[in-house]
């Protein structure tokens, strides 16, 4: 039996040739093998992959496989309406298709965070024969607290939705919602508040819903998955990947 010795520099040169120089690249390659070939991993490999996925999300590096794979949620302060008070927007963006949903509230609490999902998000995905697997939020009190008593976290658990939080003290890492908030501020709120004096939350919500319908159904995007399509077109096109995943899970 011949023993072959490979020096550390030799190992590194092999890694470099195969784009495996960093541990992150090696974990990504392992992740790809699991997705493509369904190979079985050891407990330590599974733990390493889970740490990588959570770390990527926490630092704003989002990999998304299909609609519903990862939803991004955030709170946006809209402003004040006389006679109503402070207005907060709960925002949801599907990181794959960029389909966006939003609802207005006068408070920001765990209940309002859960209400957006219950009233708008999950019914929409159910209507399209899909669900939501994981949510990405910052560490605000409306999204984080004691899991056993926190309304938002209880709602996620009740619906079997995983929860990833952005890196502490770096709320900007939830970049998907940040970009959407800039868009909605410039294209909707700044225009709407110049044109109209709103007297109620319901009146503003009606106009917001009309703009969101335009955003999802007519406004094209140049993002990684959209490629010039609207968010809804991208979601419908990506439904095949969702169906394939469900089929594969049912075969296990």
PLM region spans:
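Short, basic interhelical loop/turn and adjoining N-cap
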Residues: 1-13
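Positions that flank functional sites
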Residues: 14, 30, 140, 170-171, ...
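The DNA-recognition helices of helix-turn-helix-type DNA-binding domains
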Residues: 1-2, 17-18, 139
